[in-house]
């Protein structure tokens, strides 16, 4: 395995790209570089990485007891691959940094961190998660949500529908959320209602960020916002209750948000990578499927092309005027 630029990336660059990252959460780096005679490039002697794989499982709001569930999946993969597999828990940012610093081989990532993992670690998505709450199997909708009794109505065109939001109080999920900010902002730009993300205040009467799906929806339920932007699956427990769901409706939807998936580091040899993918696909089989469902409520993993899967996100980022 070769040492790539990510292995020698300066601390300052990494800090800028991944603000607030706690790299030490993943322990000490076990790899050292050794120059092999008659070779122009350095070869990574991964002390332990040749006989241990590390998988990062990001914590999500709909996941509970994640370490034990991740350990169960790691144990299954270890049995299939014949090598120890270690499960690490951390947020998406820490997962990307672990890939960059060669402290992890595999990570479950949402789409925006997957782009960052490609940029910083040359990692790529090979599998995507399927959920019953995803309308597009391994893509889902970003939705503009209003109170059920709102005077705002879905019109014959997207522009006519969204034009009604001028001067209204808007609750986005967070400035980094794909379905809760990037895709809805890209849609507003596409319809010619705003120029980019920096002009949202010129269109809405108020712009706020809930911090997560639940809080953005609660802002609408409590009358603090006229509309919220979230993922379609957030209109279900545990994000809100069934009673709260019945008080809301979707005003407009934006399709094509890439589902979360599994990224594999480029330092993993091709043959090993294919074995990892095959082992993970065994989680789709009935006798193993509960292990997968327990993680993030996904029912299946499917193979995807990295560039094709993330293309809608790249387009939305460009429309919104946001760097990948």
Language-model segments: residues:
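A conserved helix-loop-strand patch within extracytoplasmic ligand-binding domains
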Residues: 130-181, 186-191
